[in-house]
Amino acid sequence: MLDDRSKLLLKALVERYIAEGQPVGSRTLSRASGLELSPATIRNVMADLEDLGLIASPHTSAGRVPTAKGYRLFVDTMLTVQQEQLPTVQLMPEQPQKVIANAAHLLSSLSQFVGVVMAPRRASVFRHIEFLRLSEKRFLVIIVSPDGDVQNRVIFTEADYSQSQLVEAANFLNANYAGLTMEQVRERLKLEVDKLRGEIAALMQAAVSVDSEAMSGSQDEVVFSGERNLLSVSDFSSDMSHLRRAFDLFEQKTQILRLLDISSRAEGVRIFIGGESQVVPFEELSVVSAPYEVDGQVVGTLGVIGPTRMPYDRMIQIVDITSKLVSNALSHRK
């Protein structure tokens, strides 16, 4: 647990490093903190902060820089988001693809980092469902959409089922849940599982426990904008290996999509610092994200990707405002 003096010095160090990008020494920190402490006292506090893993000393400098752990403590307990005068912007109610592209561009232009938007997920409504036994504990689920599109999905279960049990489960789903999305079916099954025979309930839960990507038949689309902005960020431009890793992430998309999917399950803005998420193990990269809605339902996520040395207070405002603009534009689309 940090005392007040240590917190003030850590806060001053993080803010100075974010602003200037240079390791912060004890004399600079003494001036920045406003505390009447000797450089020797500040050095002792900095040594304690370093022992706690909150700051680190680059080999080429006597100053200190925040670690991902230090940034996290700063963001969670010390960051004050003051209302900043952002440019007046508006996203017009248009086709979803255009709203998404405009939002990604807006995020990158306001942040001067990379804007990212996960496109709205299509709700996978089914009209008819069938189960076919392929082998022991392995079954084919056939789902027919209202438009007549057919999706096939192989599932594996802990127990084995006879064809008569498969027919019984399919008949129950078709009679009670046809016309609903898979998400709605999942929610209904949670409430009604006690009323169903155990083996049938387990089979139906296995059938619908697939993500929207699999059932829609297409990968979630993710739109990036402003990737070249990272070329102007010293944290990346000074180390080509960092740039290559960042652009590999943007090209492959999978890890970014997983991170955005995690964010979609939370309320409000989320901040992922460095490699703490385990999904994007990149110590020099942070993501500030927030979900957006259509008619009150979360359908996607957007955010800003940049260096861990980013002005988090400003990024939070940019992401929060953009998520509200996108929600409004998509909800009021004619």
UniProtKB/Swiss-Prot annotation:
Matches recorded under InterPro entries: GAF-like_dom_sf (IPR029016), HrcA (IPR002571), HrcA_C (IPR021153), WH-like_DNA-bd_sf (IPR036388), WH_DNA-bd_sf (IPR036390), WHTH_HrcA_DNA-bd (IPR005104), WHTH_transcript_rep_HrcA_IDD (IPR023120)
Keyword set, alphabetical order: Repressor, Stress response, Transcription, Transcription regulation
GO process terms (BP): negative regulation of DNA-templated transcription
UniProt GO MF annotations: DNA binding
Organism domain of life: Bacteria
HAMAP family named in the record: HrcA
Family per similarity comment: Belongs to the HrcA family.
Purpose of the protein: Negative regulator of class I heat shock genes (grpE-dnaK-dnaJ and groELS operons). Prevents heat-shock induction of these operons.
Protein's UniProt name: Heat-inducible transcription repressor HrcA
Organism field: Acidovorax ebreus (strain TPSY) (Diaphorobacter sp. (strain TPSY))
Gene that this sequence comes from: hrcA
